From Swiss-Prot:
Gene that specifies this protein: rplC
GO molecular function: rRNA binding; structural constituent of ribosome
Source species: Mycobacterium sp. (strain KMS)
Entry-linked HAMAP family: Ribosomal_uL3_B
Example of a GO cellular component annotation carried by this entry: cytosolic large ribosomal subunit
Taxon lineage: Bacteria, Bacillati, Actinomycetota, Actinomycetes, Mycobacteriales
Keyword Cell wall biogenesis/degradation appears in the UniProt entry: no
Keyword Ribosomal protein attributed: yes
Source organism, top-level taxon: Bacteria
UniProt name for this protein: Large ribosomal subunit protein uL3
Amino acid sequence: MARKGILGTKLGMTQVFDENNKVVPVTVVKAGPNVVTRIRTPERDGYSAVQIAYGEISPRKVNKPVTGQFAAAGVNPRRHLAELRLDDESAAADYEVGQELTAEVFSDGAYVDVTGTSKGKGFAGTMKRHGFKGQGAAHGAQAVHRRPGSIGGCATPGRVFKGTRMSGRMGSDRVTTQNLVVHKVDAANGVLLIKGAIPGRNGGLVMVRSAIKRGEK
């Protein structure tokens, strides 16, 4: 069986109680339904993968090349497309074009990796962006309390090294949180309750995949 995955929408966080009446913070993810639109093979594409689509969209907003891809698969256009890489070509036997994937691809207690786009913070200084300590609050410090300090030498090296941590745009990055636990699968509502927090804003697109470091299938 190939490594499983599904596209979904982060709905927000809540809390539930486990069998020991302990409070468990969970993130609610509307998982799917996804539809398989293409299966890639090494002979034709050079690698093994399955392409899945998710989300409603007006056909008028889809360009003709993409519309042709959906028509070839025999499905209505969807808003989002993603690929799940497969370990080997034999894993593609678990999928077929037009197949629908729902939250039931996962089970209670499964370990997953969740990928999303982190919240944008705008332009941020080094204390917020990189956790710099800042400078003294007193003892002669004047108007430098949140400044980063020196960014390098003078004549030597005569330049600023690449990768030097500075102020700049913070957030809106592709982030993956690994080894989260699926607390419960609500198949009736197509919802996953994932223990803990996941990246991104409410309403954001997320990809939920089997945890790679645990060898989940």
